Amino acid sequence: TDIRTGLTDEECQEIHEMNMLGMHAYWSIGLIANALAYAWRPFHQGRAGNRLEDHAPDYVRSALT
């Protein structure tokens, strides 16, 4: 038992495993979300640019005009 935390080595390893699992889940969800966002609307600009008016749904375009 560690005097500073009061946890055993096994408890510390269990907490570490849960933290790593949470981090991997967070990174995986972020990677998937960014891939979907890129598939929907690429981050790079083409020759004509990447104007909202060219890609927005009709209800957004009507609100802009």
Curated annotation (Swiss-Prot):
MF annotations from Gene Ontology: bacteriochlorophyll binding; electron transporter, transferring electrons within the cyclic electron transport pathway of photosynthesis activity; metal ion binding
Gene3D superfamilies from the UniProt entry: 1.20.5.250
Disulphides: none
GO CC terms in record: plasma membrane; plasma membrane light-harvesting complex
Binding site for a bacteriochlorophyll: H16, N34
Keyword match Cell inner membrane: yes
Keywords carried by this UniProt record: Antenna complex, Bacteriochlorophyll, Cell inner membrane, Cell membrane, Chlorophyll, Chromophore, Light-harvesting polypeptide, Magnesium, Membrane, Metal-binding, Transmembrane, Transmembrane helix
TM spans (from-to): 18-40
Membrane topology: Single-pass type II membrane protein
Membrane-side (Periplasmic) residue stretches: 41-65
Top-level taxon of the source organism: Bacteria
BP-aspect Gene Ontology terms: photosynthesis, light reaction
Ranges of the Cytoplasmic topological domain: 1-17
Localization: Cell inner membrane
Function: Antenna complexes are light-harvesting systems, which transfer the excitation energy to the reaction centers.
Record-stated family: Belongs to the antenna complex beta subunit family.
Subunit structure: The core complex is formed by different alpha and beta chains, binding bacteriochlorophyll molecules, and arranged most probably in tetrameric structures disposed around the reaction center. The non-pigmented gamma chains may constitute additional components.
Name the UniProt record assigns to this protein: Light-harvesting protein B800/830/1020 beta-2 chain
Organism from which the protein derives: Halorhodospira halochloris
